[in-house]
């Protein structure tokens, strides 16, 4: 690492510690040439995969699109902004952990539905109705029945 004071490359790490809930490393460094000290922060650069749409086209992952979809489903529901941000983080982390360069939009949609199911079942049904293109009330009823049976299966 170049010293910001004298531009020499011979620096030594004096101290390292985790910050930002373990997502970042703070390093205290000392230049071996001019003996000035400075701080650096390191984070992992994880790239989001490209999204393969249902029609086969590819586009960059758009976090804003994901946020808007969650907010639309959760509109006028008693869910905190923090809970929404946690759900967004969970989806991003899941996609990064897959380690794929490209991922089908179907995988993202299913993960979003999983997160919504844990947050608010009404929002889940709203999202599912659009995502799965419900055509009539019987499809809503079937999804609600499935939701009601799910807790019994895990008990």
UniProtKB/Swiss-Prot annotation:
HAMAP family: NrdR (MF_00440). It holds the Pfam family Zn_ribbon_NrdR. PROSITE patterns: ATP_CONE. Belongs to the NrdR family. This is Transcriptional repressor NrdR. It comes from the Bacteria. PANTHER family: TRANSCRIPTIONAL REPRESSOR NRDR. GO terms for molecular function: ATP binding; DNA binding; zinc ion binding. Negatively regulates transcription of bacterial ribonucleotide reductase nrd genes and operons by binding to NrdR-boxes. Residues 49-139 form the ATP-cone domain. Binds 1 zinc ion. Its cofactor is Zn(2+). The keyword DNA-binding applies. The gene is nrdR. One of its GO terms (biological process) is negative regulation of DNA-templated transcription. Keywords: ATP-binding, DNA-binding, Metal-binding, Nucleotide-binding, Repressor, Transcription, Transcription regulation, Zinc, Zinc-finger. A zinc finger (unnamed) spans 3-34.
